[in-house]
Amino acid sequence: MTWGENRIDLFAVDEKGMAAHKYWDGSNWQPEGDKTENLGGDFVGEMAATSWGPGRLDIVGCTREGKYMHKYFNKDSWSKWEDFGGQFASPPSMVSWGPNRLDIFGIDVNGTLLHQYWNGESYLPEWENLGGPVSCFAAFDFRNVQG
């Protein structure tokens, strides 16, 4: 996942359930060595991450209680964790197809594929039901990047 040239961001859940972050700055991994940036939380499974532009990162993780939690980085600092709620049985997936747009997907405990999005001003009032039951899914975004 990247927000620009020569930048790679990695997110993981450590053995204590906290979100961990490490990034490539074009010449070195930061923080250096085996250290990571601790972003807190109490997660299980994989994190989802995306970027809608330079200096912007969004991550979502699933807590032990099955809630999705969201955090973003905007140029120089991380937000607090935002509770998206839910009773999810899958890790989240997230894509962004443009500035100020996030689409988050997950499977709830009933096997229903759910969708939530940010349109630059607000989220949907409730998770959108995309059908089911399903056991797995993949989300993909495409942006025509011209250089």
Model-derived features: positions:
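A structural motif
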Residues: M1-G147
